[in-house]
């Protein structure tokens, strides 16, 4: 064999050969990413967006007044002009489960809205507020109407 095919071999690589192979793979990945993604890699901002442009809300996927947050306690961010929301699912026997989250401007139609739930005997009541963490358990009674 002569030429390029003769230089390729299936024998085990030594430490130097492994390093060369890893460098070749890394170079191939970088070149492929540059070709596929173009300049988008350079467009990524080096800093996170300023947090003062967002409303910070309390998020809990399942909460009761007696036990607190049972599932998914977290914080969510939504652009200014949006709202924090707590959704109450209630019935006449005093059952009350809450879900807290962020709502964008398009979803604010639900604010201060009560409707029957798909389950007979229960209703859903939305409460919205517009200050940082206004829907967390400590602030909810003072800031949500």
Swiss-Prot record:
Residues 55-145 form the UPAR/Ly6 domain. N-glycosylated. Residues 1-38 form the signal peptide. Expression restricted to the caput of epididymis. Detected only from day 24 postnatum. Keywords: Disulfide bond, Glycoprotein, Secreted, Signal. Glycans are attached at residue 91. GO terms for molecular function: identical protein binding. It holds the Pfam family UPAR_LY6. GO terms for cellular component: external side of plasma membrane; extracellular region; protein-containing complex. Its main location: secreted. Disulfide bonds join 57-84, 60-69, 76-102, 111-128, 129-134. It is found in: Secreted. It comes from the Eukaryota. Forms oligomers. May have a role in hematopoietic cell differentiation. This is Lymphocyte antigen 6 complex locus protein G5c. It comes from Rattus norvegicus (Rat).
């Amino acid at each position: 064999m002569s030429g390029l095919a003769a230089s390729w071999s299936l024998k085990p690589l030594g430490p130097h050969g492994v390093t060369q192979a890893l460098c070749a793979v890394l170079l191939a990945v970088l070149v492929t990413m540059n070709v596929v993604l173009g300049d988008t890699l350079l467009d990524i901002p080096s800093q996170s967006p300023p947090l003062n442009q967002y409303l910070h809300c309390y998020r809990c996927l399942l909460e009761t007044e007696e036990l607190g947050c049972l599932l998914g306690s977290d914080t969510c961010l939504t652009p200014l002009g949006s709202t924090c929301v707590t959704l109450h699912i209630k019935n006449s026997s005093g059952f009350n489960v809450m879900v807290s989250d962020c709502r964008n401007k398009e979803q604010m139609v639900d604010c201060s809205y009560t409707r029957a739930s798909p389950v007979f005997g229960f209703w859903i009541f939305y409460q919205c507020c517009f200050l940082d963490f206004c829907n967390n358990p400590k602030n909810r009674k003072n800031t949500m109407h």
